[in-house]
Amino acid sequence: MIFLTLEHILTHISFSVVSIVITIHLINLLVNEIVGLYNSSEKGMIVTLFCITGFLIIRWIYSGHFPLSNLYESLIFLSWNFSIINMLPYLKNLKNHLREITSPSTLFIQGFATSGLLTQIHEQKILVPALQSQWLMMHVSMMILSYASLLCGSLLSIALLVITFRKSRSVVGKRNKFLNRIFSNIQYINEREKILLKTSFTYSINYYRSHLLQQFDFWSYRIISIGFLFLTIGILSGAVWANEAWGSYWSWDPKETWAFITWTIFAIYLHIREKKNAEGVKSAIVASIGFLIIWICYFGINILGIGLHSYGSFPIS
């Protein structure tokens, strides 16, 4: 009973803290960056990380096995991975927009995990025979690590596409209208001053947008590369485990099939990135497709509850 109470407290503290952190990020987006608020958001994510870590440790001690036996535990572990990724810029003493991606992801995943939809699988149960193996921790942890990394990298690619398309469509039009309105009101200024004003204004916007796109592209590529490595290790370890449990390395189970599709999509992404001048839109489109594929592989199969991996599903009725 004590363990369950502690789990309940830690999950709700972490959820509340992440909510506050996201509010701080929104304030920073609406007004000029406030150093005190930025530091508070960093400390808030540290608190969240410790709370989720405490939850996993308590769950591990209470159950006697690593907490990755069902969808609820894997979602908490997934949010823990997002918290780890969120801390990477902090450890390197960098300020970028990675937290605007990871913080809402942590909130969404943990909010869903602690919602009423999964109450039936919150309680600990005896592991089914197929999961009573030393491969549980190796295989499932690698897969969840890969999901977290690939989802984060894909979200950065989606953000890159949104900014790029806004730049090519709406932003240019709005900027031209704004400049035309300015120039109509300052006709008395000489031509040299007009050109200087236009150049300065356009350059400042383009420089900020270009820097933002470079950051998204930089972090997206590196996080996806790490996630692809985790995914490869997870699939290989899963094949070895499957051979021990079911007598076959590969059965084209729905989960295995979609894991292979996910691996193929991000292999294509990395192949595109190997080409010269491949940064930007083309690879980001592939990563965006991969974002949907990951959710089908991870979550969609659990909803259907079919195949050899159905023990990780939850009832939807």
UniProtKB/Swiss-Prot annotation:
UniProt-recorded name of the protein: Cytochrome c biogenesis protein CcsA
Biological process (GO), any one: cytochrome complex assembly
Domain of life: Eukaryota
Topology within the bilayer: Multi-pass membrane protein
Location(s), subcellular: Plastid, Chloroplast thylakoid membrane
Keyword Cytoplasm tagged: no
Pfam families: Cytochrom_C_asm
Provenance organism: Pelargonium hortorum
Segments passing through the bilayer: 17-37, 44-64, 71-91, 101-121, 143-163, 223-243, 252-272, 284-304
Subunit structure: May interact with Ccs1.
GO MF terms, alphabetically ordered: heme binding
Any Gene Ontology CC annotation: plasma membrane
Protein family per UniProt: Belongs to the CcmF/CycK/Ccl1/NrfE/CcsA family.
Main function: Required during biogenesis of c-type cytochromes (cytochrome c6 and cytochrome f) at the step of heme attachment.
Keywords: Chloroplast, Cytochrome c-type biogenesis, Membrane, Plastid, Thylakoid, Transmembrane, Transmembrane helix
